[in-house]
Each structure stands twice: as C-alpha cells, then as structure tokens.
Swiss-Prot record:
Keywords: Cell membrane, Membrane, Transmembrane, Transmembrane helix. This is UPF0295 protein GTNG_0491. Belongs to the UPF0295 family. The chain crosses the membrane at residues 12-32, 42-62. GO terms for cellular component: plasma membrane. It comes from Geobacillus thermodenitrificans (strain NG80-2). It holds the Pfam family DUF2614. Coiled coil: none annotated. It is found in: Cell membrane. The keyword Cell membrane applies. The keyword Transmembrane helix applies.
Length: 117
C-alpha cells in the first residue's frame, strides 16, 4: 500500500483543527487540578494558546488560499487550488502539476522542495 497523500491546503487545515482539539483537551485536563489554582490556570492558559495558534493558522491558510492557483481537475472537472509545483486535487486526489517537466512522472511531494544549485 502506497503513501496516502493529501492536498497541502487540506493538510494545513487539518493541523489547525487538531490544534483546537489539543487546546480543548489541555483545558479539560486543567479541570482535574481544581484544588491547585496555579496549575489549573497554567493548563487553561496553555489551552488558550493552542486555540489562538489555531486561529492564526486558519487566518494564514485563508490568506494563502486566496493567492493559490485555481485549476480545473482533468479527472473530476471541479475547480481546485494548487500550492507549489505539484499538488493533489482536493476532491478526487488526482496528481496535478503546472510544470511541463513533471507531466507524466510519478507524484512525489519532493518536487515542491527548493532545488540546490
């Protein structure tokens, strides 16, 4: 079984969503320390920081998403956004590229790394 890829925008959104869950869980763990207000406050503040970080990531991916190149997927025909030289369709996971050199090659996220000259 091969590596399961996802579009870059969806990966970043998933990361931001996981930050929300981590923040809520950390705040919930703080409730177990109700007898110690200092420890409980630390957990609550740490959880709040995770939630704020999530908001920052969501804002960042939103601004990045507005600048992403929109292409029509040849497989499903839906408009999807591309970041980098290669990306996947958000809907059907079809490998997409705007680089003529990479057409027909096996999909690999390494193509998005900057080349050292």
């Amino acid at each position: 079984m091969g590596i399961k890829y996802s579009s870059k925008i969806n990966k970043i959104r998933t990361f931001a969503l996981s930050l929300i869950f981590v923040g809520v869980i950390v705040m919930y763990l703080g409730l177990f320390f109700r007898t110690s207000p200092i420890i409980m406050t630390l957990f609550m503040v740490l959880g709040l920081l995770f939630l704020v970080a999530s908001g920052i990531v969501y804002f960042w991916i939103g601004t990045l998403s507005t600048r992403a190149v929109q292409v029509v997927c040849p497989s499903c025909g839906k408009v999807t956004k591309m970041l980098g030289r290669v990306d996947l369709c958000m809907f059907c996971r079809e490998p997409l590229t705007l680089d003529r050199e990479l057409e027909g090659k096996e999909f690999d996220e390494k193509y998005n790394k900057k080349r050292k000259n």
